[in-house]
Amino acid sequence: ITGSKTFITNGQTANLICLAAKTDKDAGASGVSLIMVETDDLEGFRRGKNLSKLGLKAQDTTELFFEGVRVPKNNLLGIQEGQGFYQLMNQLPWERLLIGITALGAIDFALEETTRYVRERKAFGTRVMDFQNTRFKLAEMKTKAEVTRSFLNDGIQKLDAGILDASTASMAKWWGSQTQCEIMDECVQLHGGYGYMMEYPITRLYADARVQKIYGGTNEIMKELIARSLDV
């Protein structure tokens, strides 16, 4: 194996890596295979620097380099070469639904933190919670959270039944991550200046949210997949 990878989560610590590699450069999508690479004392393998990210500080993200790395044939994931692309595609609906679910978890925590903060914080001698704007914003965010929860529960039921389709999964990923980012922005605003300080949970939640619209397929790609399902 010769090549490099970037944006690899937990790449600094992983000792077992699922690698998508070209096993037939002339076969297009059918030339991709998934190979399990055991990195301990592996000749030709090295890790790059730990990349500096906007958010998700609790996990490392790194570059990986492979220079003539050799692995046993039985490290191939699956029964034959050339199935890697299709294996990955089969997992995408599950992954995209999961991104929506993690978005909802972050939304719930952000609303809990923000509600607690505005109950305790006073401005001009009045609880921030008692301002109409605050109450309206919280009402809007809570409603969006519950709408998201209902849709995701439907997606989970479809996943359990084996009928989760690409379009529904794309909706879950797009709507969940978009709503997450919108709500984090509103929650930061309700914290005022403290919402810009990294020691407050809401600030870290805000920073962590942004990448949700990028990984797992950008939200623009999600919209394209949803639109394709309508043009049949």
Where do the protein language model's features map onto the residues?
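A generic fold-level signal
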Residues: 11, 27-29, 58-59, 164, ...
